[in-house]
């Protein structure tokens, strides 16, 4: 902290303020109280006084030698052409001599010059002193002339003011005279008028003329008086303006004179300081505290005058040798020319906290002298406001990138995340939510960034085609509960036998068919009704125009029926209800209608908008009415789509065929899909190599609302992905690769974020059993359904862990993964190849095959039940009453007992009850009857018993005998 007054400086020196005031008075510094301010010059004068009073001499000179060493390497080829590395070490040595001021520095610089040079130096200094005196005299003469000029201007100003005052007085006198003359004239006129009236009282016409004349004269006199007053006012305003202008000129002249005085004072002190030896009375003197060598920063005049004084001291070496390589050969203490000419050395030695860049710094770096040259102004740093940045956070970002966006160190981000309970590294990828929380925690504003993704080109690059909107067939999704006859109804419509081909008689795949009727084409989507296929049904409702809700007349509304209604309402799709199985004796269509009304589906006959059609998939009753109602709804919707345009659609189902590769069933929603088109479906892309209809027959094109199966994609696309035709395969590849990377980054970030949470959960829950599974299915929809169904089986004690799930056959990679993770492989409608089977047998990997989802779920549930810890139950087998107590040496207390209930076995556990309160629980140590060891004693018999580690048995106690049995638990 810099000392600003006497009291603070005394506290810094750890001495009484009164003693310091006495020393300041002795040094010639006039300070009256402890609150008086102290300048650096005052402190310097006090220091000089104390040095002189203690007998310090100016001849005590010390010097400092700095040695710099720089090592570098160069590579040079020898005669054989082989490169060699040579170490080059450059050493530089400089000597600094302590100086009190510029004059003494010049004398020290000339210490090695001969005595004859001293006389020349003295003459040169006298000449410079004479020139400085002449310059000062000239400046003083100029100042006197300017002061005389200012005095003349002041006299002129006063003269002008007096003249203006005299003019103002004259104007006032003239105005008063005019007013008096006007009053006299008016009095004469009044008297004349009265005389005229007295003389000519009878002449009325003549007096009227006289009155008019008098009124005109009075008006003229008033006008003249008004003009005189205006002239006087203008003269006064002009006088005031002149006075204001004179005052401004005087102030400007005084300010100029003050500036001249300050200008004259500043260089005079600096030049005297540069020529004459330092005097205690001169304030601008170098501050020397505690024997340091530094000098305070000088004003511009001093810095301009200093080279003129320094130059002769080092002129000889600076002028005789050129700058450059010759300067490097000079000795460190030989002169100042080499130090000043070298641009790298001119910057000086940097010290910590010095922001001057080495300019005009007279101190070295080092632990003892560090920071002493700073004045009080440089030590204070104003507080700055925290900078709040707007940070754009992408979907995934590493810790280092996030820190760079906030302009802070990565270690700060890591510290904040450690406080939040998450251990991260500098290269770890964070998801968007976590990164935004960290940004908010650090006081910045987080904004979800919009990525420069190539998908934006899809929207920007869409050319508006003028293709004509033509009517298209309706897309009808058949939905309902399992076993309500959806597929059988479609079979009757298609005249096919699809249901017989499904395993277990239930639909486990989403199917797409189009049917040609006399009134038009209808495209049907058949969705599974099992509860596991929720995602499939949601995809079917998303791509549909009309929903046919199939409800069995004998079963009514079931859970999946309600779910189908919810999907249809969420998509805003009209519903046509088909009440199936009306040919059964127990069919009750009216009950079905009432249940559907309760769910919000009101029939048309009740005033609603949903047609109800009773049908029988077995006999074909009502099929035509159903198709009629579907086409009627389609006409109301007025479904249209462009045909002559690039195709767009949706992936209904996807699978991996061993011979064909990735195969996708897509529904074209607009445009026409041709064989050879480049398609993009999610992260998969490719050229359509083959296109088949639902019957497996090749086709060249597919229009709106037509389902087709395409081949040629790079990978199996996700079910529900949008399919779009692009003109360029390069653009399709770019977008697909971008989507793959984004999906991978997001998945990795979420996995890393969940690692610590799951670890802490497992630590808190104790030992949790894991059932690792690898699932391979024939199509993606079945794989999704099976994964979701199995994950729902997880409990607090046994957890289902899906290590890997994919579409396709079971390969060696799957078996190797199962070996590493100790997982069970489940194949749903898929099989393992020969190599995978052989590898699984050698590694003991269990592979299970299923074709019905019920069986897979039930067997996994049974396996999880076997992993549950068995439940321990206590079974009370008998009660014993203590009749007598015996003390047996080396054995302890033996109780003579009567078995009052049940049976007592040797291996049982026992509780000791006293007054129906349990006082001990342990095991039987011995069980005897008539001195013979027995295994059991039944009710009504006496026996002798001893309890292990318990001898405090009294008569009247009861022993409760029990056994612990383990019971297997089930889910």
UniProtKB/Swiss-Prot annotation:
Residues 526-529 are annotated as: G3. It holds the Pfam family GTP_EFTU. Residues 505-509 are annotated as: G2. Residues 49-86, 101-385 are annotated as: Disordered. It is found in: Cytoplasm. One of its GO terms (cellular component) is cytosol. Residues 471-640 form the tr-type G domain. CDD domains: IF2_eIF5B (cd01887), IF2_mtIF2_II (cd03702), mtIF2_IVc (cd03692). Residues 277-286 have a biased composition (Pro residues). InterPro entries: DNA-bd_dom_put_sf, EF-G-like_DII, IF2_assoc_dom_bac, IF2_II, IF2_N, P-loop_NTPase, Small_GTP-bd, T_Tr_GTP-bd_dom. Residues 580-583 are annotated as: G4. Residues 355-368 have a biased composition (Gly residues). Residues 105-114, 178-209, 298-325 have a biased composition (Low complexity). Residues 616-618 are annotated as: G5. Residues 480-487 are annotated as: G1. GTP binds at residues 480-487, 526-530, 580-583. The keyword Phosphoprotein does not apply. Its main location: cytoplasm. Belongs to the TRAFAC class translation factor GTPase superfamily. Classic translation factor GTPase family. IF-2 subfamily. One of the essential components for the initiation of protein synthesis. Protects formylmethionyl-tRNA from spontaneous hydrolysis and promotes its binding to the 30S ribosomal subunits. Also involved in the hydrolysis of GTP during the formation of the 70S ribosomal complex. This is Translation initiation factor IF-2. It comes from Burkholderia ambifaria (strain ATCC BAA-244 / DSM 16087 / CCUG 44356 / LMG 19182 / AMMD) (Burkholderia cepacia (strain AMMD)).
